[in-house]
Amino acid sequence: MGIRGMLRAAALLLLIRTWLAESNGPSPTPKFHFELSSSTPEVILDLFNCKNCANEAVVQKILDRVLSTYDVRLRPNFGGAPVPVSVSIYVSSIEQISEINMDYTITMFLHQTWKDTRLAYYETNLNLTLDYRMHEKLWVPDCYFVNSKDAFVHDVTVENRVFQLHPDGTVRYGIRLTTTAACSLDLQKFPMDKQSCKLEVESYGYTVEDIVLSWEDDNAIHITDGLHIPQYTYLGRTITSKEVYFYTGSYMRLIVKFQVQREVRSYLVQVYWPTVLTTILSWISFWMNYDSSAARVTIGLTSILVLTTIDSHMRDKLPHISCIKAIDIYILVCLFFVFLSLLEYVYINYLFFSQVPRRNHRRCRKPRRVVARYRYQEVVVANVQDGLINVEDRVEDRAGPLPDSPMQAHLASQESLGSLVFTSEQAQLATSESLSLLSSASSQTQLATGESLSDLPSTSEQTVPECTIHFHGFLTNDSIIPIKIHSRSDACDDEDSEESLSSEESHGHGSSHTGRLKLQISQRCVQEASWDLDKIEILQDDISITSSWLGLDEQCKGDADSIWSLTDEELMACDQEKDSSSESEENCSPSPGCSFNEGFSFQLFKPNRVPKVDRWSRFLFPLSFGLFNVVYWLYHVY
């Protein structure tokens, strides 16, 4: 048999093979199997088998055959074992992770693979690739995304669906879609947070009795190279699966989690550095003078305003949730430091502008009170009856004739007065007989004996003697008995003193002596003598009298000069009774008997601490803020 005969036999067999492939039912003729020799070329063998070749007619015949009896409403192996469906995902992009909406958008290719024996074919070994039009003719699993908010299938330029049919009936279904899935973000460490956004795949209607979902393999999730997520860095992914139970049955759920970490560099530039610089700016006030109220308060308030603006800007980008974020703590601490700087200045302002000026104001009022002491005096006269005439005679002998002035002071005897010291005071003492002649309307006090009262002229133009009298005490047979005579000005305000001065000037020279020296005499704390006046002996050298004559104008000028030339010690002595309580509270340390609150208040509000507080704040504030930053960043970064 030659080659020609072999070719004819091969052509005949090929025709028979084609006829058998095109027939719908089983062939009534028996199938022959030819054992060709090993020397037969492979081309001849391919002509007989035809597994790797297919034309349009062959594919059309295959599709027509498998779809003619195919029911799309029934799952594969209906009534039998559940259909295993394997799932794989190829992630092309993660476009956005929104903190406000708590979701993220992902674009991916979803592939599902299952086996449907109704679609098996044997005409060829080639896989058949079919487009989106087969979606309505074939059964597909009803998978959906559990946490999806919105999703759509891309349809540019055509609907992005594809089917691959294998000869054994395996179907691989792929779809390109974009979905927006919910992502529960944990913002407690914002913006140094790490998030895990998951995507859940589940069958909508088929329970585990019909469909069993599973991941294709351990590498079922594929990520495109160079995946870039805005404001985040991709860390990795994990895949899990679990069975969930509902009222309609149990379902298999596939879960993939994408781990991402937020990039903090943008927040360092936009939030942290401005916040730190603003906080440091508020500390400039510690180097300013403590009486620069406007500058220090302006810096503090401006810093608070800037921090509040930054905080409001951040809140607009974040959801309104109840958890406290790390950036909230940082901004709040910065606000607290700025507030402490303002509070520190309030403390200094209270010490400097409240405590110290009060003491200075009282010191400025002391000369006025000394003037008031000259004008308003209370003279307490002891009950002395004898010896006034002798003292008067001695005063007249040493000082000369008395001037014709209503302001002349007639001195009492040594037996009746003791422990009196009048320095440049024109307070006139009178006997008990002359006390009844005092007139409150004229406010003049004239102390003299009965013989001298009739001789005093009433003119105001005569000169007034200036007398300095010192009484040391009385000597009895047994001991020296001092007599206490209290001289004290009335507690009057500065406004009353000024009104008295103005009214005094308005009366003119006619009443100058009367207006300048108003004496209010009241018998306070009068010590009644319990001794016998006859036993009182005059102490020698106990009275020293200095007398001189001054004109009225010179005396007024001299009085004013003597008042304003007083030293601090004299002013303190003159004002000791008025300000004893207030001075002791501010300038003296609390006694051991004081309560704890008083001692603590004294230690806390000492005026001399004003410069020290600023010096301490220059170091304590930066040190505390630096320590806070170390703890803050170590906790949230590592």
Curated annotation (Swiss-Prot):
GO terms for cellular component: chloride channel complex; plasma membrane; postsynaptic membrane; receptor complex. It catalyses: chloride(in) = chloride(out). It comes from the Eukaryota. The keyword Transmembrane helix applies. It is found in: Postsynaptic cell membrane; Cell membrane. Residues 1-21 form the signal peptide. Disulfide bonds join 183-197. Expressed in brain, lung, and spleen. It is a multi-pass membrane protein. Residues 491-515 are annotated as: Disordered. PROSITE patterns: NEUROTR_ION_CHANNEL. Residues 289-296, 347-617 are cytoplasmic. Glycans are attached at residue 127. The keyword Cell membrane applies. Its main location: membrane. Potentiated by etomidate, propofol, pregnanolone and pentobarbital. Theta subunit of the heteropentameric ligand-gated chloride channel gated by gamma-aminobutyric acid (GABA), a major inhibitory neurotransmitter in the brain. GABA-gated chloride channels, also named GABA(A) receptors (GABAAR), consist of five subunits arranged around a central pore and contain GABA active binding site(s) located at the alpha and beta subunit interfaces. When activated by GABA, GABAARs selectively allow the flow of chloride anions across the cell membrane down their electrochemical gradient. Heteropentamer, formed by a combination of alpha (GABRA1-6), beta (GABRB1-3), gamma (GABRG1-3), delta (GABRD), epsilon (GABRE), rho (GABRR1-3), pi (GABRP) and theta (GABRQ) chains, each subunit exhibiting distinct physiological and pharmacological properties. PANTHER family: NEUROTRANSMITTER GATED ION CHANNEL (PTHR18945). This is Gamma-aminobutyric acid receptor subunit theta.
